[in-house]
């Protein structure tokens, strides 16, 4: 970790503006950090050395001319789910072997238009399906954090594990990520970073490989709350190519940071106290409540009665949409093609060889719940539950609550290749217990580091906001960050 790679986005932006450093120096520092660490951490599946250097050179020229954009010269990593023109985009799946898009996703196009530099594509769970970044065709990502005195590798969380690990290990200044049921917030909590899932419709989905279209939303993972605010401002936009994109002004999120919490009402939902929740998570939650109280917020006990149905409903809705979205991968136009006796056999062979175990599992669940005779019993009921979950939140917000504080995850990061979890998918799915409600209701949610456990691992809290009121989340998350401090892993890689 060099002095340059230790800079936050806000610090690097100021130094670039003052011409104390150049974009080329900053980019080279990150590229050399990646080259020395990536073999161990496995955060990147493709490093774009030449492109990064030419983008940095162009940034330096714009800075010299006084034409710097909001992210001029800031080196970022891009989750492998975002289409990047002419650059490896495979959703970390074998079935998309060799795919290089002819177009740029709206999110990445917005970032490059603001002057950001692309370092490369980040590892992730295959098609964003996973909570540990162990389902990637390119192998598992290692969490830069380790327990005190231990050499055991831990997962970085998922599906945006590469994004979170790269940010925590200082292998990029910030990263793009996506969240369908917790894939930004859970890895952020596991790696001591900040991750925000914006309101559904705030950020365009165009050019992002689809998992579950009614739940997917892109957002940033960053080192601190201010950096997350800076990135979201650039990522968000109205996009007529995405029918769910919302035509609302994009606030200056950074301006919300440091504002007083006086008069802010924070709800504490009793239903989030789940059986078997470790003491350290309960203690962290109490600590977070105190931090917000000390910052001037009013704490209110609330009820979200349908919370317990969120996880089973999510694991019906998301696989159903995935089975439909992933039907397009058949080996005909692009990606992997395995020859067969006839066209139907070719489809079958290609999909059998191209998809990993977890993706196949979810496609099968999705196809089953959508099939005749089961559609009403499963899919329709899950959608009704989803409406009830949304109504729970609406009722609470209607009573004047501005944001809701909950744990982000039911534990700290767990071990890599945990056989117990590998053999029991339901146990693995329980990692999403605190995060899926936010996607089901289309709300914004942020994960912010709030403490370190006895083993020296980071723990995160989650704040859930009203639709399109991300500023409130940045404001409250910053208060927690100020009280808890920032956490960086000790370098072992």
Swiss-Prot record:
Coiled-coil ranges (or none): none
Enzyme active site: 79 (charge relay system), 159 (charge relay system), 183 (acyl-ester intermediate)
GO annotation terms (biological process): translation
Primary enzyme class: ligase
Protein name, per record: Glutamyl-tRNA(Gln) amidotransferase subunit A
Alphabetized PANTHER family for the sequence: GLUTAMYL-TRNA(GLN) AMIDOTRANSFERASE SUBUNIT A, TRANSAMIDASE
Lineage of origin: Bacteria, Pseudomonadati, Pseudomonadota, Alphaproteobacteria, Hyphomicrobiales
Subunit structure: Heterotrimer of A, B and C subunits.
UniProt KW keywords: ATP-binding, Ligase, Nucleotide-binding, Protein biosynthesis
Function: Allows the formation of correctly charged Gln-tRNA(Gln) through the transamidation of misacylated Glu-tRNA(Gln) in organisms which lack glutaminyl-tRNA synthetase. The reaction takes place in the presence of glutamine and ATP through an activated gamma-phospho-Glu-tRNA(Gln).
Record's keyword annotation contains Protein biosynthesis: yes
Reaction catalysis annotation: L-glutamyl-tRNA(Gln) + L-glutamine + ATP + H2O = L-glutaminyl-tRNA(Gln) + L-glutamate + ADP + phosphate + H(+)
Pfam families noted in UniProt: Amidase
Family stated for the protein in its record: Belongs to the amidase family. GatA subfamily.
Family matches, as InterPro entries: Amidase, Amidase_CS, Amidase_dom, AS_sf, GatA
EC assignment: 6.3.5.7
Taxonomic superkingdom: Bacteria
Molecular function terms, GO-annotated: ATP binding; glutaminyl-tRNA synthase (glutamine-hydrolyzing) activity
HAMAP family: GatA (MF_00120)
Species of provenance: Brucella anthropi (strain ATCC 49188 / DSM 6882 / CCUG 24695 / JCM 21032 / LMG 3331 / NBRC 15819 / NCTC 12168 / Alc 37) (Ochrobactrum anthropi)
Gene Ontology cellular component annotations, sorted alphabetically: glutamyl-tRNA(Gln) amidotransferase complex
């Amino acid at each position: 970790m060099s002095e340059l790679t230790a800079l936050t986005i806000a610090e690097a932006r100021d130094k670039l503006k003052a011409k104390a450093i150049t974009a080329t120096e900053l980019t080279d520092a990150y590229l050399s950090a990646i080259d020395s660490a990536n073999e161990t951490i496995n955060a990147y599946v493709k490093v774009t050395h030449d492109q990064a250097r030419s983008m940095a050179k162009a940034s330096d020229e714009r800075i010299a001319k006084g034409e710097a954009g909001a992210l001029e010269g800031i080196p970022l990593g891009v989750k492998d789910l975002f289409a990047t023109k002419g650059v490896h985009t495979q959703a970390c799946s074998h079935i998309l072997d060799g795919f290089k898009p002819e177009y740029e996703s709206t999110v990445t196009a917005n970032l490059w238009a603001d002057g950001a530099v692309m370092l490369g594509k980040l590892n992730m769970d295959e098609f964003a399906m996973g909570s540990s970044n162990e389902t990637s065709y390119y192998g598992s990502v290692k969490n830069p954090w380790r327990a005190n005195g231990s050499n055991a590798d831990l997962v970085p969380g998922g599906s945006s594990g590469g994004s979170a690990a790269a940010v925590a290990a200082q292998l990029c200044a910030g990263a793009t990520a996506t969240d369908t049921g917790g894939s930004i917030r859970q890895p952020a909590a596991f790696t001591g970073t900040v991750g925000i899932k914006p309101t559904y419709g705030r950020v365009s989905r165009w050019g992002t490989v689809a998992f579950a279209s009614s739940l997917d939303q892109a957002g940033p993972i960053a080192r601190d709350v201010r950096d997350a605010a800076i990135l979201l401002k650039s990522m968000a936009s109205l996009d007529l190519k995405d029918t769910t994109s919302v035509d609302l002004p994009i606030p200056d999120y950074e301006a919300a940071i440091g504002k007083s919490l006086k008069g802010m009402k924070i709800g504490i939902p009793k239903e989030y106290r789940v059986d078997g929740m470790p003491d350290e998570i309960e203690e962290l939650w109490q600590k977070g409540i105190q931090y917000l109280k000390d910052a001037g917020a009013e704490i209110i006990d609330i009820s979200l009665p349908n919370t317990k149905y969120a996880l089973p409903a999510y694991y019906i809705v998301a696989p159903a949409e995935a089975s439909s979205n992933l039907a397009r991968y058949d080996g005909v136009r692009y990606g992997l093609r395995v020859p067969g006796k006839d066209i139907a056999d070719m489809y079958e062979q290609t999909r059998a060889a191209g998809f990993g175990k977890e993706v196949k599992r979810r496609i099968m669940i999705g196809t089953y719940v959508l099939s005749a005779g089961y559609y009403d019993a499963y899919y329709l009921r899950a959608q009704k539950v989803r409406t009830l979950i949304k109504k729970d939140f609406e009722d609470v917000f209607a009573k004047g609550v501005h944001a809701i504080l909950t744990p982000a995850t039911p534990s700290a990061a767990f071990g890599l290749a945990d056989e117990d979890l590998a053999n029991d998918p339901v146990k693995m799915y329980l990692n999403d217990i605190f995060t899926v409600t936010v996607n089901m209701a289309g709300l914004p949610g942020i994960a912010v580091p709030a403490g370190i456990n006895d083993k020296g691992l980071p723990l995160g809290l989650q704040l859930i906001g009203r639709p399109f009121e991300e500023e409130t989340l940045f404001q409250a998350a910053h208060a927690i960050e100020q009280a808890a401090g920032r956490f960086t892993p000790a370098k072992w890689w």
